[in-house]
């Protein structure tokens, strides 16, 4: 840690920025060349080594062999597609389902413009972005759980 650039806390300009909640990006370890030349290659090589090592140590196949003539009773997508799958499943008009999925990134693109006057990077000082994130997370988890249930319980989860 001694090779990192320490902040000069006696500097009045830095102290004024820190008092306003700003200035934390003006000191620290520079990305070039430290991160890009030394840290990133170590992480990339370590990731490859772990992946290859695990593939060599445990070469077993994942799951059973596929049979193209035996269709499962209920076809479910991968777990990360559960919320969008459930959204398309419960909205009767498919165009509305696709538009509702397109509204998610469109809504996320508007958040920086709504909070462009806020100079803070702390999430607790950015209430709109934090609220959008928390509501989106809860709705995604709710829809993901509902995707594994029958269609009549997909939205209520059988609770209501």
UniProtKB/Swiss-Prot annotation:
This is Cytochrome b6-f complex subunit 4. One of its GO terms (molecular function) is ubiquinol-cytochrome-c reductase activity. GO terms for biological process: mitochondrial electron transport, ubiquinol to cytochrome c; photosynthetic electron transport chain. HAMAP family: Cytb6_f_subIV (MF_01344). It comes from Pyropia yezoensis. The 4 large subunits of the cytochrome b6-f complex are cytochrome b6, subunit IV (17 kDa polypeptide, petD), cytochrome f and the Rieske protein, while the 4 small subunits are petG, petL, petM and petN. The complex functions as a dimer. Component of the cytochrome b6-f complex, which mediates electron transfer between photosystem II (PSII) and photosystem I (PSI), cyclic electron flow around PSI, and state transitions. It comes from the Eukaryota. The lineage of its organism: Eukaryota, Rhodophyta, Bangiophyceae, Bangiales, Bangiaceae. The chain crosses the membrane at residues 36-56, 95-115, 131-151. Belongs to the cytochrome b family. PetD subfamily. Keywords: Chloroplast, Electron transport, Membrane, Photosynthesis, Plastid, Thylakoid, Transmembrane, Transmembrane helix, Transport. Its main location: plastid. It is found in: Plastid, Chloroplast thylakoid membrane. GO terms for cellular component: chloroplast thylakoid membrane; mitochondrion. It is a multi-pass membrane protein.
